[in-house]
C-alpha cells in the first residue's frame, strides 16, 4: 500500500511539472490527465508577488464596512455588526432597493448613522470605490463572489466573502493572486469553524488530548426543501442543476483542515470523488425550473489524502430527507470526537485523568455526560471566553456567526493575521471543481493545487491570533 501511495505521489509530481497543457488537456477544461491523474492548470505569479501567510495589515481603528447583497445572509450580517464595537456600516448595496431600505432601517433602529445606499446591477462597483470603506462584506450568489472580491481588493479594500469564496480552481487562483498583489486580506466567511463544539475540539487537539490526528470527516447534509424558494431568482438550484461535485464543501472541510494544520505543516495532496444518480434533485429541478437534466448527484462523497498521510472524508446532500448533519468527526491516536447525531468524546483513560470516575472511562465508548460537560468547559476556546454570552444573545446559527464577525473585526483592529486567510478560502472552495472533475472522469484521482506555491510548510500548526 505504501508503495502504491509513493508511486501515485511521484506520478502527480511528474504531472504538475510537465507543463501547462502538455500530456492531454481535456477540450474546454482547465485541467489535463496524465497517467490517470487529473492536474489542474496553475498560473504563474507576477514578478515580486509575495505570499500572504501570517499577513497582518496595519491596525484599523474603526472598521468601516460596505455590505454587498442584503438577502438572507447579508441582512443578518448588518444586524450583527450593530453589536460589534469599533465598526460602522457606511454602505449598503443590493439589486433590490427595498432590501437596502430594510437594512437602513436596521441601522436606524440600532441608533447607528445612516449608510450610503446603492442598488441596481453594477452599483456594487461604486460601493467598492467609496473612499471611507475599508472592508467589503460580500453576501451575493456564488457566481459573483470572485468578481466583486477582486474589484474590492484592487480598490484598496479588505474583503470578507461568503462561502464558497469561488466556484472554480481558476477563480481560486485569481483570489490568491490578487490578494498577494494588493496585500489585502481576503477571508471567506466560514462560520462553522466558530461553532462552540468545533472550537473546543480544536483546543483539545492543540493541547494534545487526541494524540496525533489521523482522519477527519465533515459534510453538508441539509434538506433544503424549506429554503429553495427563498433564493433570489432561484440562483442556488440553478447552480446545482448545472454543476456536478461537492459544490458546498466548506462547512465540513473548514474545521477538518484546522485540526489537520492544512497549509500549516501539511497540505491536501489528492482526492477522489463519486456521486449517486440524481433523482430527488432532478425531480426538484423539473418542478421549480422545468429542467430535464440535473448535474449534481443526490449524494456526493469525496475522500482526500494529505502529504503527511492523513485522510478527510466529505459528504454533500441537500436533496433527500436526511437530518441536518455536518458529520464532524476527528480521529486521533488517543481520542475521538463526533458531533452528530449526538456530540461526544472518547479518549484513552490516561488522556483525561483527574475527572470524576475517570478510572471507569473506556476508549470503547463516549465519556459520560458530566465528563463531557467538564471537558467542554475546561477546553473552551480562549477566543470565545469573553464573548460567549453576547454571541448567544446576538445569535446567528447559535452564536457562531457573531463570533466569526467579532474575530474578523478584532484581528483588523489589532493588526493581527486573520483566523482564515486567502489560502483557506481557495483550498476549501476548490473542492467543488476538483470533485466534479473526478466524478466526470470515472472517479480518477485529482491533484489538489498548492495555492501557497510551496510555502505550505512555512507555518507549523494552526493557531488563532491572540
Q: Which stretches of residues belong to each language-model region?
A:
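Beta-strand-loop-alpha-helix segment that lines the small-molecule cofactor/substrate pocket
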Residues: 135, 141-142, 146-194, 208
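Glycine-rich phosphate/pyrophosphate-binding beta-alpha loops
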Residues: 298, 314-325, 396-397
